[in-house]
Amino acid sequence: MAMTAEVKDELSRLTVSQVSSRKAELSALLRFAGGLHIVGGRVIVEAEVDMGSIARRLRREIFELYGYGSDVHVLGAGGLRKTSRYVVRVSKEGEALARQTGLLDVRGRPVRGLPAQVVGGSIADAEAAWRGAFLAHGSLTEPGRSSALEVSCPGPEAALALVGAARRLGITAKAREVRGTDRVVVRDGEAIGALLTRMGAQDTRLTWEERRMRREVRATANRLANFDDANLRRSARAAVAAAARVERALEILGEDVPDHLAAAGKLRVQHRQASLEELGQLADPPMTKDAVAGRIRRLLSMADRRARELGIPDTESAVTAELLDEA
């Protein structure tokens, strides 16, 4: 089951005892999933959701909290719809429900954000508002670089109200418009986990956190492997470059190179992949890596000085792009 479906399934089965929270959830669900229609002079409340369990929860809450019956219509998958959709409709008492849930204000005008009783309610009401909004139009992507918990909103006022509810819960959410649709997005991994718990999807949070941890472990392992590969490549190129410079130095100096410097240089050329420490152990008598490095450095310096005097290419000229590409 996809993460979004897991969250919605868990939330649709959540038992909430506090009446004000149940009302806040219902108001948000109707606001984010529904619309008000005037048919034959009557106000009709409709809400379209993507799971049967959400439709059942919605109908049950409408009846238990306000005593109104509702109809449900199933829109089968087909065309642009990949899955079935469920439309819950309250026709006979639509206007009364719209007023009681805050979809209409006292003058009978549609409320553009969230109802005042939800915005000014308790922390539990803020959690319930997020639960209702997510059940209506929420989504949760798999953990990763672009992971996000997102809710599509019916307008900018509703988006800002949802951002405010998140702020009351100590969670940073951002409102933005994407392709003409207002959305509220939470991207931080810790904040996503906290919000899932706040809404009541603790089991899904544990699953999400486990997947997030596994992904982070894999990403860390990949970074370390790439780091090691890069270090090996750098070391190989440095060794090839050093050997090429030493070869050129011996060429420039010819018979004039001091024996101890020539010996260190020949070791570098003969054992191109060996570390300085390994070259020191191969020397006769053995030397420290600092001694080997010092002798090679002096050899190169002497050769470069001679090259300048003679007006010929120095040791750096031996290190070509082609040479490094082959390393």
From Swiss-Prot:
* Keyword terms: Cell cycle, Cell division, DNA-binding
Q: Which cysteines are joined by disulfide bonds?
A: none
Question: Which InterPro entries would you find in this protein's record?
Answer: Homing_endonucl, Sporu_reg_WhiA_N_dom, Sporulation_regulator_WhiA, Sporulation_regulator_WhiA_C, WhiA_LAGLIDADG_dom
User: Where do transmembrane segments lie in this chain?
Assistant: none
DNA-binding region at which residues?
Answer: 275-308
* Gene3D superfamilies (alphabetical): Homing endonucleases (3.10.28.10)
UniProt-recorded Gene Ontology molecular function terms:
DNA binding
One GO term under biological process is: cell division
One family from Pfam that matches here is WhiA_N
Job description of the protein: Involved in cell division and chromosome segregation.
Q: Which NCBIfam families match?
A: DNA_bind_WhiA (TIGR00647)
State the family named in the UniProt similarity comment for this chain.
Belongs to the WhiA family.
UniProt protein name: Probable cell division protein WhiA
